[in-house]
Amino acid sequence: MDEVLPLFRDSHIPQIKDYQLELQNDLTKTNEAFQKNLLKNYNKILSLTDSVNDLSLNLKNVDQDFKSLCFNDEKFQLNKLTPLPYQTTTHISPPRDEEKVSIPSQNILVISNWTISINNFCNRIVTSTTPSRIFDELLLNFHELSLIPVPSKFEALVKDKCCRLQKFLVDSMKTLNLTLLQWVKLYNLLNTEFSSKWDDDLLSIFNESLFETLFNDNVQALLISSANSKDHQYHSNQQYKDAIVVDFVNSSTFRDHLIRRTVKEINTHLDTLSTLRAKLKEPETLHKLDIFHDNDTNLNDGTVSPLDDDALKQYIDTAVFYSKGLTNDTTLQIYQTVQPTIEILQNLELYKCPQETLTDLRNKLITQLQEFKTQISSRLPSPLENSTSVVDDFITSYNNHNLLQLVIDQITQLRQQ
């Protein structure tokens, strides 16, 4: 008010209107900035709200327990001990082992917190807005539990909770949104700590599922990042270079699983290659690649333009396939099977696969390619044949020669590995 009165005394109406517009503009900018910051920090606000809610619930529980402790006489009141009868000789039986040593209350608290952390992890990790906090609490309480001796009366409880955690991890492997580092920490927890408490069958299932999940990601990025302490230009994620992850990737267990999985993948490709080569013996089942799209009825009615990006890319790709002699769907599938297999064999050598296994797989692929080469050679037209269509025979011969050269190059590449 003190600022407005002088304005009316000393300024004209247009100046007052300008001041009002300027004030409205400032209010609008301030409101926009507030909304922007509110959206930017919305997740933090939700996280804080969740924490406050948890704290409030805990305080209510503590308050109820404290009231019960103070006023529930039937449960907590200490009655006066009856006087002991006077005896000259007292025979006391020796206490059992569990009665000789009382359990410290601190140890009971550790076991209780550990039990709660497992319940929270299994019940809330999927839906919580702060899953990392629940995960960290689980590992922390496992660490605290490892520092105390577990009393025999609690061993059944500990084993039961460990089994529950294992079942949850196995059943929820595909739905849990954990980071690579968190998965590795769980693997280390289940394979290096509390070994006597874990169920062996569930542990085996967990390990196999975990490795399969990790191998579905970019394994090559893992191996490169673990071997190089500097940031990789394609994979700058810090978790790839964490010491725990690096040690895990460089472990013999990881390498053995990776080699077994890769060998299985190569054998699958070899089986596919055998099936495709058998299909070549039935020419009526082959479908020629259509580079000109003569059957495309929509090409001239404006529905699809030959200049569309997808159509243009398809023309170029098909032309490249033709230049390599890949003129039908089966030879193209053979090429698309062989080429990745060669790359996988190179990776297998990087994984330090036993040389005899590597040589055996390479020889199997070379043998199949040589048989494929023989099939191609048998399709080359003889120069003594009377051609009914010189142009067709020339194109067929040209394509087969290109395909033959492609296979020869692949065999040479394999032998030079």
Swiss-Prot record:
Bilayer disposition of the protein: Peripheral membrane protein
Keywords from the UniProt entry: Acetylation, Golgi apparatus, Membrane, Phosphoprotein, Protein transport, Transport
Coiled coil stretches, renumbered: none
GO molecular function, a single term: protein-macromolecule adaptor activity
Signal peptide positions on this chain: none
Cellular component aspect of the GO annotation: Golgi membrane; Golgi transport complex
GO biological process, one term: retrograde transport, vesicle recycling within Golgi
Compartments reported by the entry: Golgi apparatus membrane
Residues the record lists as Phosphoserine modifications: 305
The keyword Signal is assigned to this record: no
Positions carrying N-acetylmethionine: 1
Function: Acts as essential component of the peripheral membrane COG complex that is involved in intra-Golgi protein trafficking. COG is located at the cis-Golgi, and regulates tethering of retrograde intra-Golgi vesicles and possibly a number of other membrane trafficking events.
Family stated for the protein in its record: Belongs to the COG1 family.
Note, other: Present with 2190 molecules/cell in log phase SD medium.
Binding partners and assembly: Component of the conserved oligomeric Golgi (COG or Sec34/Sec35) complex which consists of eight different proteins COG1-COG8.
Protein name: Conserved oligomeric Golgi complex subunit 1
Lineage: Eukaryota, Fungi, Dikarya, Ascomycota, Saccharomycotina
Gene: COG1
